[in-house]
A protein has these predicted regions:
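Cytosolic-side transmembrane-helix boundaries in multi-pass membrane proteins
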Residues: 1-31, 39, 44, 218, ...
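Short loop segments and helix-boundary regions at transmembrane helix junctions
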Residues: 17-25, 89-97, 121-190, 226, ...
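Single transmembrane alpha-helix segments in multi-pass membrane proteins
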Residues: 42-46, 56, 61-116, 130, ...
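Short, non-helical or kinked segments that cap or interrupt transmembrane helices
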Residues: 47-52, 89-106, 149-158, 232, ...
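Hydrophobic alpha-helical segments embedded in the membrane of multi-pass proteins
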Residues: 75-86, 107, 138-142, 164, ...
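Transmembrane helix-bundle core of multi-pass membrane transporters
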Residues: 155-226, 279, 333, 364-369
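Helix-loop-helix "hairpin" substructures at the membrane interface of multi-pass membrane proteins
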Residues: 202-279, 303-304
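Transmembrane alpha-helical segments in multi-pass inner-membrane proteins
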Residues: 259-265, 271-339
Length: 370
């Protein structure tokens, strides 16, 4: 019986593990292609010199020592939230509630700084604020985990909705604590006394934040890869049935992991309020909870690689703002360039994991069958 159906021109085949230098070569090639595409679009749409545009992006992050430290601060905050969501992601618990957990930590820190400024010493107030932020973030992460463990609720929707609750809760307290009344904002908390503010190192208010997040990065890496708890959450992520078979209490792991994720987000909230911004607003989290999802996936849940992924995203965000200001471009155009670069970077992961296998020529196939 003749089979007249043709084999597809190509099909997708999963690769074996590529050597690290080949994988990074593909990523580097993707970045180069992305920059070329962005240059063509920039010249076509705006008429600007793409080299000047790229130079402006680089200068916005590396043009001075202060700019470098601002980049480091932005990188650290993104990295902190990425570290927070990663344990849950490894467990296949889709924690989209980083925004709300950060705001919970921010609210707790601000409450301590406002309500306890005149009653406790500065060092003790900082410690209380840190602990309160950790607890607040852990509670905010623990609520959806409890419902997931108890009634198998959808964690994606639950954690997402918790973001809106946290935002409105912060908005409520901003009105209560607003200075002056009717201003709709709190302003700088304890500006004259600086009670509850993290100390500066060498006159640099960003350095301590960066150090804390780097220490946290090492701790999370060790926790995920060399601890019993890290092993358990990986097993749960691979198969809940297998985890139960080997005696792992899945519900306990879910709650424990989300308490940890929320606590780390709470630390980020504390660093934002007590370390750098010294205020409270609904926009203080700055969308980091959602950006962290992309960073965590881009780094394949590896805390060390997240350092570079976070720096890339922070650099692109800062550069996009700079070129929209310096060249008078619509900020949406800057976001388009950022999106194109990210598209190529994320898309290249497909070619690292898979390859295209093309249909063999008819003559060659016949020769092989002889």
């Amino acid at each position: 019986m003749n089979n007249n159906s043709k084999e597809p021109l190509f099909h997708i085949v999963k690769r074996g593990a590529l050597p690290w230098y080949k994988a990074w070569g593909i990523r580097l090639l993707a970045v180069v292609i992305a920059l070329i595409v962005c240059a063509i679009i920039t010249m076509t749409v705006t008429g600007e010199n793409p080299i000047q545009v790229y130079a402006t992006m680089i200068d916005s992050s590396f043009g001075s020592e202060r700019k470098v430290w601002i980049l480091a601060q932005n990188t650290a905050m993104l990295l902190g939230v990425s570290l927070a969501v990663t344990p849950a992601f490894r467990m296949r618990f889709w924690n989209i509630g980083g925004e709300g957990q950060i705001l919970a930590g921010c609210l707790a820190a601000a409450a301590c700084m406002i309500c306890l400024a005149d009653t406790v010493p500065n060092g003790l107030l900082i410690a209380i604020s840190a602990v309160a932020s950790i607890i607040a973030g852990a509670i905010w992460g623990g609520i959806p985990a409890f419902f997931k463990a108890k009634w198998n609720t959808n964690e994606t929707l639950f954690t997402l909705m918790m973001n809106y609750v946290a935002t409105q809760l912060v908005a409520f307290f901003v009105i209560i604590w607003e200075v002056p009344k009717g201003a709709g904002q709190i302003g700088i908390i304890n500006q004259s006394t600086q009670i509850g503010w993290l100390p500066q190192i060498g006159g640099n208010k960003y350095m301590l934040n960066v150090i804390i997040i780097l220490v946290l990065t090492v701790a999370v890496y060790v926790y995920l890869n060399y601890s019993k708890h890290g092993y358990e959450l990986s097993v749960v992520g691979e198969s809940e049935r297998t985890a139960r078979y080997v005696g792992i209490k899945v519900e306990k792991v879910i709650i424990r992991t989300m308490l940890l994720s929320g606590a780390i987000c709470g630390i980020v909230g504390f660093l934002l309020v007590s370390g750098t911004d010294h205020t409270l607003s609904t926009s203080l989290s700055g969308g980091r909870g959602f950006t962290a999802v992309m960073i965590s996936w881009l780094a394949k849940f590896n805390p060390i690689i997240m350092i570079f992924a976070s720096m890339l995203l922070a650099f692109l965000d800062k550069g996009a703002s700079a070129i929209s200001t310096n060249f008078g471009l619509n900020h949406s155009f800057s976001d388009i360039l950022t999106g194109i670069i990210l598209f190529f970077i994320i898309g290249c992961e497909f070619f690292i994991s898979y390859k295209l296998s093309f249909r063999k020529a008819a003559g060659k196939e016949a020769a092989e069958n002889v």
